[in-house]
Amino acid sequence: MFSSRWKKELGFGWNWIYNSEIIQSVSDNPEGPYQFLRVILPRRGRAYFDGMNTHNTCIRYFNGKFYLYYMGTSYGGEIPQGEETSPERNLEVWNRKRIGVAVADSIYGEFVRRERPLLSPRDCSHWDCTITTNPAVAILPGGKTYLVYKSRCAVGEPLMLGVAVAEQPDGVFQRLSDEPILSFDDPDFHVEDPFLWYDAERKKFCLLAKDDSKNGSRGITGEWGSGFYAESDDCLHFEISDAPKVYSRYLNWKDGHQTRQGNMERPWILFDDTGKPDYLFCASGTGENPYSFQGRTFIVAQKMCLK
């Protein structure tokens, strides 16, 4: 498993853009427990776009190599040590999020990073002029690679998803369209945390993403923070399912009790040996209110039931 972490004593706050690092853990089965193995992408210096912080992993395999896609940031000034950071500084660093890739010959080998982002924001005439983040990748059998990413045009504007394509997994990526892949008439319909895969049998691009609706909007699913499903023939024109909700913030545990989680972030699917979705993983934590974690955060694994 590839995930991200930072020191518990720092609290949650905005440390996912200041103090996060990507790690690797191992387990004998999908449900765990997982044992920490090593840090994959530590800090490497302020001169790099990802030199101070790495987060939001997406691991893929193709033709003998492992491709680890991620979001990175760099920033000047002091490294936050648990104190509250100003909204102005948070926004400055948030706007420096960029997608990168690191490549290894073995899942246990050295992951080598690029010096430059895999995909950068465009100029201010476009909807994705602020950031590129939350990478979701599908590699087709011939190596053609589709990259779904999150961005927005300004503070308070809708979070939306775009798509870029390359002839090989490490680029060069070019956007498929000037417009986002999902857009809504209601400005309170925000989407983020995509997970993308290609169903070769059905020749469909499949998308799982988080309903991040704002201002009390019912959003796509009717439940903030839940996940919805959409699919496409070309990874550009997506149709949201008639029954879109894939997962909820309500969890039913093996001992029979139910909890409402504050967050279910960064959905990730593990496939079985036949290529069918098997387990859904999400980042979560203790506490019922969004982003108000009480004590600890963790990763949840849920066995999937296909309909």
Model-predicted regions and their roles:
Residues 1-307:
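Carbohydrate-active catalytic/glycan-binding domains of CAZyme proteins
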